[in-house]
Design a protein with these regions (language model features):
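General beta-strand structural signal in soluble alpha/beta enzymes
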Residues: 114, 140-143, 164-167, 198, ...
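N-terminal ligand-binding/catalytic initiation module
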Residues: 2-164, 358
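Generic secondary-structure signature for well-ordered alpha-helical cores
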Residues: 46, 50, 61, 102-109, ...
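Rossmann-like adenosine-cofactor binding region
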Residues: 243-310, 315-317
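Short, ordered loop/turn segments at secondary-structure junctions
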Residues: 78-80, 88, 117-118, 143-149, ...
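Glycine-rich phosphate/diphosphate-binding loop of Rossmann-like nucleotide-binding domains
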Residues: 83, 88-108, 160, 166, ...
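Adenosine-phosphate binding glycine-rich loop
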Residues: 167-168, 187-189, 291-390
Length: 390
């Protein structure tokens, strides 16, 4: 059985103490300019601030030169799909959004502000973001339930001239594709030939499937299942997002679909993939069991029946964590630096390949220190780079 990570466990009380120690919360705003004299104050506010105001009024692009817009991202949620906890409301999502904001700063030196919108109406959310969106260089949507997340993101992309990125969809897809690229390399398999089974048909699963197809996996080689079974053409009550991934097949269950599969991607619920199912997979199976907090199958259960498997999860206490933190800060960093108006499929694929390539490099000392002294090397237990790898 493969070993677990050396990352220390923590209790709920320790997490609460972390958020409550010193100043409450995790973020604060600091001045980037001197603010120690009366002259500094006059330049920063009245009357000096009138000069950049006039310039921006004449040329809105000047906001990139005279304000923090070009390095500022709004992290936005309505709390309708918080982590694995569900719909707990806008305010309850604030610790997550603050956490997202600090990750932007820590890993890509991007300033981010969390904004929680207390509404379940996608049109209200769209209208709100449209009104303040131009104050930011980019919009990161987070923890918004499907199908509203699709509707909101698409409309904002059409309306705003800055990048809009739903990380639960695209961050997951980019990181998963990076892991898949390396897993296929280690397994000597071609992306054009593999058979893939996806459990879950929510935002993350649909985004992963979309990116897999753009990357070269044929449509008919991917079988997707929701809580009612396989998405097949002719099945009743499929929305437009699920219908796009329905295929002609007589397969109806996970047990049938997994037979001979090269790849299993789980973004669904715990314990739905059994040892017997894993036994039926192809040689050198690739298993991404990413349900949180508990995976579709535990890695040790996989290794009990298959010593040729490559396994990834969404957890930090196992190797190969599918963690969006290795993606979204740097994707936004690149987009902001070139003043991109959108984050397109080509950019996502390029990011996935860059992340995959990073895992093949030697692990530097600072990464080993952050991982409790471990120095992983590219292979079955290190297909996705550490969060702390610069």
């Amino acid at each position: 059985m493969k070993k677990k990570s050396k990352i220390e466990k923590y209790t709920d009380q320790e997490a609460l103490d972390y958020h409550n120690s010193g100043k409450s919360g995790k973020i604060e705003i600091n001045s980037s300019k001197p603010m120690s004299t009366q002259r500094d104050l006059a330049l920063a506010y009245s009357p000096g601030v009138a000069a950049p105001v006039k310039v921006i009024a004449e040329n809105p692009d000047a906001a990139y030169d005279y304000t923090t817009k070009g390095n500022l991202v709004a992290v936005i949620s309505n709390g309708s799909a918080i982590l694995g906890l569900g719909n707990l409301g806008a305010l309850a999502s604030k610790p997550v959004m603050e956490g997202k904001a600090i990750l932007f700063k820590r890993f890509a030196d991007i300033n981010a502000i969390d904004l929680e919108i207390d509404s379940s109406d996608p049109n209200e959310i769209i209208n709100s973001i449209t009104k303040f969106g131009k104050s930011f260089g980019g919009i990161n949507l987070e923890d918004i339930a499907a199908p509203n997340c699709f509707i909101i993101e698409q409309k904002l992309k059409e309306t705003l001239d800055i990048p809009v990125f739903h990380d639960d969809q695209h961050g997951t897809a980019i990181t998963t594709l990076a892991g898949l690229i390396n897993a296929l390399d280690i397994s000597s398999k071609s992306i054009k030939d593999i058979k893939v089974v996806v459990t879950g048909a929510g935002a993350s699963a649909i985004a992963c499937t979309n990116l897999f197809k753009v990357s070269g996996i044929p449509n008919e080689n991917i079988i997707m299942l929701d809580s009612k079974g396989v998405l097949y053409r002719g099945r009743d009550n499929l929305d437009q997002w699920k219908s796009a991934h329905a295929i002609d097949t007589k397969v109806r269950t996970l047990e049938e679909a997994i037979d001979g599969a090269d790849v299993f991607l789980g973004l669904s619920k715990k314990n739905i993939l059994t040892k017997d199912m894993v036994k039926k997979m192809a040689k050198n199976p690739i298993i991404f069991a990413c349900a949180n907090p508990d995976p579709e199958i535990k890695p040790e259960d996989v290794y009990e029946v298959r010593d040729d498997a490559i396994v990834a999860t969404g957890r930090s206490d196992y190797p190969n964590q599918v963690n969006n933190v290795i993606g979204f800060p740097y994707i936004f960093r690149g987009a902001l630096d070139v003043r991109a108006k959108t984050i397109n499929e080509e950019m996502k694929i390029a990011a996935a390949h860059a992340i995959a390539a990073l895992a093949r490099e030697d692990v530097p000392d600072e990464v080993a220190a952050a991982m409790g002294g471990e120095r992983p090397r590219y292979g079955k237990e290190y297909i996705i780079p550490s969060t702390f790898d610069p």
